Amino acid sequence: MILSGDYHTHTPYSHGKNTVLENALAAKAKGLKEIAITDHGFNHIIFGLKRKKLASLRSEIIEAEKLTGIKVLMGMESNLISVDGDSDMTESDWKYFDIYLCGIHEVVRFKSFSDMRDVMMKNYAAYKLGKKPSDKVIENTTKAYINIVKNNPVDILTHINYKCFCDLKEVAKCCSDYGTYIEINTKKRHVSAEELNIMA
């Protein structure tokens, strides 16, 4: 397989180390044709992208494209913030972005305490204890992933099953139905080879 793009990169606008231009230069050196700058979503308490910085980020992206010849997409790795499938990239934000990633993350402002408890806290407790979450927790996480895909124009779900466990087959079927890709993230081991076969 020849890779032509990298659609999950960060910059100092969230917690990345390299600038937009440095990411584009690295992509060009690796023979890639395009990349996406997908800094963490607005509700991330520590690393969240700020709405007031969007114009500056777009300006850097335009400049990086000119200097490198690489196609640079402006995106965001938004945060899933409720079981109902809400995201911190709201409908009014969609027009600012070229690509829409979404995942479940820690240290995020959820829509409500019950959403944080049901989507993150119970999953994370099981993860830290090395146990499988209850069927109800898996059901809630699965519902959250399915709802985010159904209710939003999500292009890519990021690192599903990393600390937050779902029914992979059900989520994969929903993504297939709605044209949403599922990221396989080699930095965060989140699905096994057997689970990949289940999702296929």
What positions do the PLM features span?
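His/Asp/Glu-enriched short active-site or ligand-binding loop at hydrolase and phosphoryl-transfer sites
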Residues: 179-191
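Extended substrate/RNA-proximal surfaces in nucleic-acid metabolism proteins
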Residues: 47-178
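A generic structural signal for well-ordered alpha-helical segments
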Residues: 27, 65, 175, 199-200
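N-terminal small/glycine-rich loop or linker at the start of catalytic domains
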Residues: 1-8, 116-121
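Histidine-centered catalytic micro-motifs
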Residues: 4-14, 37-42, 157-161
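Metal-associated gating/positioning segment near the N- to mid-region
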Residues: 13-51
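Histidine/acidic-residue-rich catalytic or RNA/ligand-binding cores of hydrolases
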Residues: 15-19, 166-172, 191-200
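Conserved beta-strand positions in the central sheet of alpha/beta enzyme cores
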Residues: 36-37, 101, 158, 183
